[in-house]
Amino acid sequence: MHYNTSLLCDIYADTVDVVEPLLTNFGGRNSFAGEVVTIKCFESVGLIYKALEENGLGKVLLVDGGGSLRRALVNAHIAELAVENGWEGIVVNGCVREVDLLEDLDIGIQAITAIPVGAEDTQIGEVNSPVNFAGVTFLPEDILYADSTGIIISPEPLNAEALTESDEIA
């Protein structure tokens, strides 16, 4: 399904929070949405692997990597695991790597930028706790909507199915 964050913002202006425009698309799917699962970690991918081994149908993994630009928190293997387990997307306050492989996968991935250096495989951090970056506090079970224009979050699901790419707000 295609989500149009611009139209969703117009319709639900009083309901949604808009994430500051700091992130770029890296996955093969530019538009995605789902229930937020949060991870807070710094230059470590162990908790990310653990989370993505679970069924991710209808979910988006939101990783607060502290904005680190020194190590990538998502690589092709991690993204493939997410696809295999049905995750809708991954949003990273940090870096990704292997971008040519990521763009071929049927998953939404947004991150600050790319770097070739991988992160450590330790399980240090927090799972399903509130995280704050890009001007927004993300809570577990928030609903995240993303497209090429940006990312918004809502405490409740929005009626996005009523929207199409050709819809316009008067």
Swiss-Prot record:
Any single Gene Ontology cellular-component annotation: cytoplasm
GO biological process, one term: regulation of RNA metabolic process
InterPro entries attached to this UniProt entry: RraA (IPR010203), RraA/RraA-like (IPR005493), RraA/RraA-like_sf (IPR036704), RraA_gpbac (IPR014339)
UniProt xrefs under CDD domains: RraA_family (cd16841)
Keyword list, A-Z: Cytoplasm
One Pfam family matching this protein: RraA-like
Taxonomy, superkingdom: Bacteria
Subcellular location per the Swiss-Prot or TrEMBL entry: Cytoplasm
Protein family: Belongs to the RraA family.
Matches recorded under PANTHER family: 4-HYDROXY-4-METHYL-2-OXOGLUTARATE ALDOLASE 3-RELATED, REGULATOR OF RIBONUCLEASE ACTIVITY A
Function: Globally modulates RNA abundance by binding to RNase E (Rne) and regulating its endonucleolytic activity. Can modulate Rne action in a substrate-dependent manner by altering the composition of the degradosome. Modulates RNA-binding and helicase activities of the degradosome.
HAMAP family xref list: RraA
Protein name: Regulator of ribonuclease activity A
Species this protein is from: Psychromonas ingrahamii (strain DSM 17664 / CCUG 51855 / 37)
Source lineage: Bacteria, Pseudomonadati, Pseudomonadota, Gammaproteobacteria, Alteromonadales
Gene: rraA
